Amino acid sequence: SFSESLAAAR
């Protein structure tokens, strides 16, 4: 999901 992608980018 895109929320998971944003979390991984941190």
UniProtKB/Swiss-Prot annotation:
Tissue expression notes: Nacreous layer of shell.
> What is this protein called in UniProt?
Uncharacterized protein IMPP6
UniProt organism field: Nautilus macromphalus (Bellybutton nautilus)
